[in-house]
Amino acid sequence: MRKLFLALLLLAVALPFNAAFADSIIASNAGGHAAFNVIPFGSLFGDGRYQEVYSSSLFTGPVEITSLAFSPQDTTTYAANVDLRLTTTNVGVGNLTSNLDNNFSIPLTDVYSNPNFSQNVTGGSETFSLVFTLTNPFIYDPSQGNLLLDLVISNQNQNEAFSRSGAGNILSRAYNSAGFGDGADGVGLRTEIGYNSVPEPGTLVMLGTGFLTLAGAVRRRLM
């Protein structure tokens, strides 16, 4: 009984600590929604590859990225063959080139792949209802550079457009596509990035010390 009480007490302390670290942020250039755009999720884009760079200023410390979400124009069922990869890059926002392999030096990390991806989405510039929950969450440290998304896509089932922002200093894009050729510019898809904050080592030490102190106090009371 004493062991059960102690375990439940420690769990009650740990759960609020963990929950406080789950969050999301909207990556968008100033001005918010500017237009709906079919690059890269629309069928007119065709088979292709798309990159988007996000400024490191979005985050104040290391995070574990758990999801990426985008806002479609229409309420529909969207399907495609998708592969998402992430990495850190020293290439700045607005400086991506259409030679996509030159936009990073750290190898890409596979975070989500589904040849038969299909999802019901809700239309609207602020819905962020097309959600890719990463099967391999990505640890990102903003002190090491900007965040780069690399998407390979094909077999889009419709020419669906998604919310993009105008040019700015938070995000930009580059692409190679069958439908639009190669390009790079200062705009990009507005993205909701889901993440868990990664505690600093000192925080973990303090938490561990607190647990030990609490355990000792409870043990003395139960003796």
Regions inferred by a protein language model and the residue ranges of each:
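Sec-dependent signal peptide recognition
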Residues: 2-8, 203-204
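A short beta-strand element within beta-rich, extracytoplasmic domains
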Residues: 63-74, 149
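Boundary/junction segments of secreted and surface-exposed precursor proteins
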Residues: 19-45
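A short, hydrophobic C-terminal helix/tail in secreted or cell-surface proteins
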Residues: 199-218
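Bacterial N-terminal signal peptides
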Residues: 7-16
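Positively charged n-region of N-terminal signal peptides that target proteins for export
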Residues: 1-4, 219-223
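Aromatic- and Gly/Pro-enriched, solvent-exposed loop/edge beta-strand patches characteristic
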Residues: 77-169
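Proprotein-processing/basic-patch segments
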Residues: 28-29, 146-197
